[in-house]
UniProtKB/Swiss-Prot annotation:
Its cofactor is [4Fe-4S] cluster. Binds 1 [4Fe-4S] cluster. The cluster is coordinated with 3 cysteines and an exchangeable S-adenosyl-L-methionine. One of its GO terms (molecular function) is 4 iron, 4 sulfur cluster binding. One of its GO terms (biological process) is rRNA base methylation. Belongs to the radical SAM superfamily. RlmN family. This is Probable RNA methyltransferase PST_2231. Residues 94-320 form the Radical SAM core domain. It is found in: Cytoplasm.
């Protein structure tokens, strides 16, 4: 379901624009659609036809994203296994400091070699209402003031739905534009569409290597764009929005943690409106990769930072419950597998 479909369903049961706006905001807050102001009953502000039609519609909206299981982590994050209306599963991650990582696809087609989500390929797209429903669901547990599109899927491959969700969250959803973070491997459509949007999110770009051939090997089905061109496109967007680009770099021991790569980062990012997020590799099943030792990570940060590239180590939230970067995949493969024989 897309957001306009949800709003049309409200109109179909007699809701006027003012009612639709009010009920949309209630939904975004994780509240019942007919919630009123303090000591105000639904009959005080909703037409009879809407009140009669809401129970069935509310069931349909609730089914967009149902919590199947919750897995709290020691760092205050929590991985949420979310069941969609058709029984497919995605994962959201509640982050410390009121953040939420949402999924935009069931599976992923990019197939990054260090990421679990793409192991099963792309199963289907999420509608914009299904994306927003993850936020509404999370807000039943805790406040959500930041939404990052870094869960399952490549947001650029579901661009219309993701941009619809971002627009609603950044207008009616009470989330600042800089706190909406669109993550991509570098699809050129992103750089065409995002500057045209009413809500322009912050942008995170998956870099991972300054060597074009190595980057293509790590992200085998990502657009074949040179790292230099990716950074220039990012810089143009950063200057237009006033938000620095967050460059993502999964640190892989013996692969992209060498001195040549560090000097390549300086060459590309020094003087740019950018933040380098170093993400030590998170362990997966049947690992072929490792993260560098802690001492080496500290050396890299000091080297880059002292030479003019703002560098942060992003120790992914929820690693102990497989909620960290690269670890997300639908545990529903097992759940659905158990269902099928019935």
């Amino acid at each position: 379901m897309r957001i306009p479909d949800f709003q049309q369903r409200l109109a179909d049961i007699g809701a006027k624009p003012r009612h639709i706006g009010r009920m949309t905001r209630a939904w975004l807050k994780g509240l019942p659609l007919d919630v009123g102001r303090r000591q105000q009953q639904a009959e005080d502000f909703l037409p009879l036809s809407v009140r009669e039609g809401l129970p069935a519609l509310s069931l349909e909206i609730d089914a967009l994203a149902r919590l199947r299981s919750e897995h709290p982590a020691a760092d205050g994050s929590a991985r949420l296994l979310v069941e969609l209306g058709d029984g497919q599963m995605v994962e959201s991650v509640l982050l410390p400091r009121d953040g939420l990582c949402v999924s935009s696809q069931v599976g992923c087609a990019v197939g990054c070699v260090f990421c679990m989500t793409g192991k099963s390929g792309l199963l289907r797209q999420l509608g914009s209402a299904e994306i927003v429903a993850q936020v509404a669901l999370a807000r039943r547990f805790r406040p959500v003031k930041k939404v990052v599109f870094m869960g399952m899927g490549e947001p650029a491959h579901n661009l219309d739905n993701v941009l619809e969700a971002i627009d609603l969250l950044g207008t009616e959803g009470g989330i600042g534009h800089k706190n909406l973070v669109f993550s991509t491997v570098g699809d050129l459509r992103v750089f065409e569409r995002l500057p045209q949007q009413r809500v322009k999110p912050a942008l995170a770009l998956s870099l991972h290597s300054t060597d074009g051939a190595l980057r293509q090997a790590l992200l085998p089905r990502a657009p074949q764009i040179a790292p230099e061109e990716l950074v220039e496109l990012g810089e143009t967007y950063a200057r237009a929005t006033g938000f620095p680009i967050q460059y993502q770099w999964t640190l892989l021991k013996g692969i992209n943690d060498n001195q040549e790569e560090m000097d390549g980062i300086l060459r590309l990012l020094k003087g740019k409106y950018a933040v380098m997020n170093l993400i030590p590799y998170n362990s997966l099943e049947d690992d072929a990769y490792q993260r560098p030792e802690g001492e080496r990570i500290v050396q890299i940060v000091r080297y880059l930072h002292s030479r003019g590239v703002l560098t942060k180590v992003r120790n992914s939230a929820g690693q102990d419950i497989d909620g960290g970067c690269g670890q997300l995949r639908a545990r529903a493969e097992h759940v659905l597998g158990r269902r099928r024989p019935r």
